[in-house]
Amino acid sequence: MKTVYEYYTHRVAFEGTVDECWKWIMDQAFTMDDGRKIFRTWEENGEMVYDVGNVYIFNK
């Protein structure tokens, strides 16, 4: 079974169940002190930018 999720502007077909997909997504995130998850970081003009964003899972 493939699980499709949208990550920013990309759709990804994940090889596994919805629960396996969600666990994989959560494992990739960094947890901040207040409990929020950070999914993407990058550097602009010497400063780190953090994008929490949203993840949508379509077939649950």
Spans of model-derived segments:
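Short aromatic-glycine-(Arg/Gly/Cys) micro-motifs in beta-strand/loop hairpins
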Residues: 1-10
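Sequence-pattern detector for short linear motifs
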Residues: 5, 14, 39-43
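Short, flexible N-terminal segments of the mature chain
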Residues: 14-33
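Short, mixed-charge low-complexity intrinsically disordered segments
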Residues: 27-60
